[in-house]
Amino acid sequence: MVHFTAEEKSTILSLWGKVNVEEAGGEALGRLLVVYPWTQRFFDSFGNLSSASAIMGNPKVKAHGKKVLTSFGEAVKNLDNLKPAFAKLSELHCDKLHVDPENFKLLGNVMVIILATHFGKEFTPDVQAAWQKLVSGVATALAHKYH
């Protein structure tokens, strides 16, 4: 279980309140699909994923990215209970979608990069550390059903 200090919680909540979920979510999922092309196999129904520009402009990628980042809102609301908060998503990704749990870590790392690009100097090393801890905790919670 991940333990967040009061300062880390405050840092996460403060930044989360400024995140444009639609924009950042689409960009994060899009980058995941571009940088790690083998992850595209889980998105066969999304249509054209033939190039970086096709992926980044794909409305299905943007919509699902928003959905993914919205689920991170659940993490922000449940910092002390990540595993229960992601139990159903863990089951879905394990039993029905058969997603390699390593992909959760990759997406988390991409999300940290997106946040850094969106927030620039505001994304200090302390902010990065708190968010890295969060995305790692979410990846672990999502992988829970696999164990």
Curated annotation (Swiss-Prot):
Residues 3-147 form the Globin domain. One of its GO terms (molecular function) is organic acid binding. Pfam families: Globin. Keywords: Heme, Iron, Metal-binding, Oxygen transport, Phosphoprotein, Transport. Red blood cells. GO terms for cellular component: blood microparticle; haptoglobin-hemoglobin complex; hemoglobin complex. The keyword Transport applies. The modification Phosphoserine is found at S14, S51. It comes from the Eukaryota. Heme b binds at H64, H93. InterPro entries: Globin, Globin-like_sf, Globin/Proto, Hemoglobin_b, Hemoglobin_oxygen_transport. GO terms for biological process: hydrogen peroxide catabolic process. The epsilon chain is a beta-type chain of early mammalian embryonic hemoglobin. Belongs to the globin family. Heterotetramer of two alpha chains and two epsilon chains in early embryonic hemoglobin Gower-2; two zeta chains and two epsilon chains in early embryonic hemoglobin Gower-1. This is Hemoglobin subunit epsilon. The gene is HBE1.
